[in-house]
Amino acid sequence: MLRPQGFRNYMVGKWHVTPLTQSGPAGPYDGWPLGRGFDRFYGFMDAETDQYAPELVRDNTPCDPPGRFADGYHLTSDLIDQSIRFIADHSADRPDIPWLTWVALGACHAPHQAPQDIIMSYDAAFAHGWEASQEAGQEGSQDPGQEPGEPDGDVEARLRPVTP
């Protein structure tokens, strides 16, 4: 859609548009990003991938991630780096041509994996166990003066006109 208007189009991240039977290294490639109007692609073809050891594709070619878990690699940082690289390359090569960079990060999808230091930062919050943490969260979410288990009239009133 933008290519006929003179745009260069770059896509980074989750594609998940091509059927699994057509997303392997042998193609066919017409449903891949380059076959759908993008000039460059770096990311993964399926709905999800390991955030530390992803199955990546550069343009139409499978490629290894540029780092490893042991070295601090995480897919989100890699995708941002590749986005910046596409934009920098475009600016150096074709600064007068408009461009689109579509970034679809994968960390919001399964598998949900966080860096170990972030996981460990929550240890104190859950030191008393999951149930105690859940109860504390529920208590903090209620209006002052509302009894546990008492319905929230304001929410019910707002939802009443909603028809499923």
What role is predicted for each listed range?
Residues M1-P164:
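Formylglycine-dependent sulfatase
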